[in-house]
Amino acid sequence: MLMYLLKYYPKILFIIEGTLVTLKYSVIAVILGLVIGMLLAICKVNKNRVLRLFANFYTSIFRGTPLLVQLSIIYFAAPYIINIKFNVFMAGVISFALNSGAYVSEVIRAGINTVDKGQFEAAEALAIPKFLIMKDIILPQAINNIFPSLVNELVNLIKESAIISMLGEMDLMRRAQIVSIETYNYFFPMLIAACCYYILVILISFIAKIIEKKMIVN
């Protein structure tokens, strides 16, 4: 192992640099997914039946089909369906965000349901607009309750983002594949990529625990 590290040090750095690409996809997608998830969750708890049906249908589609299929449709089929050609980055971010939004919506919906309904009724009795009730009273409490689940979604996105290598994006996985081919050694490059993913997950989990403790104190 040590001999390999010394011999292929530049190539190892080449693999590690892919961490930034992986993080870029994951962070942008989880932020967009959080926005989509919030909107869908609000639709799911809305009294309007059409909004509930739409949100549930959306969730069933994106949770019921593989992420790789969704990515392939957006990248390869979109030019024929909507006459728009997405580059690899846009296709990746869109597919990851849409998929993440479906899962996040269920997490947020569950969080909203954990908030005491009496708070909503009391706010309505004070004639507070429903939008402000949801924004200022319900959602902040729901986010506190579901923060660990949202962190898990980010962790899952980091690992699932490896499929973007199928489109040639130079992420961790793609760089490890290139080095594997160049060195005729598949074990060590993949091991290095796995270690990078693992370290990312550990760091994010550690930071999340610190944030969660501060949220509990506040």
Swiss-Prot record:
Gene name as annotated: glnP
Pfam families tied to this protein: BPD_transp_1
PROSITE patterns listed in its UniProt record: ABC_TM1
Location within or outside the cell: Cell inner membrane
GO BP terms, alphabetized: amino acid transport
Single GO term (MF): transmembrane transporter activity
Keyword terms of this UniProt record: Amino-acid transport, Cell inner membrane, Cell membrane, Membrane, Transmembrane, Transmembrane helix, Transport
Designated name of the protein: Putative glutamine transport system permease protein GlnP
Record's signal peptide: none
Coiled coil: none
Start and end residues of each ABC transmembrane type-1 domain: 19-208
Membrane topology category: Multi-pass membrane protein
Any one cellular-component term (Gene Ontology): ATP-binding cassette (ABC) transporter complex
Entry-linked SUPFAM superfamilies: MetI-like
Residues annotated as transmembrane: 25-45, 57-79, 86-108, 187-207
Source species, domain of life: Bacteria
UniProt record similarity statement: Belongs to the binding-protein-dependent transport system permease family. HisMQ subfamily.
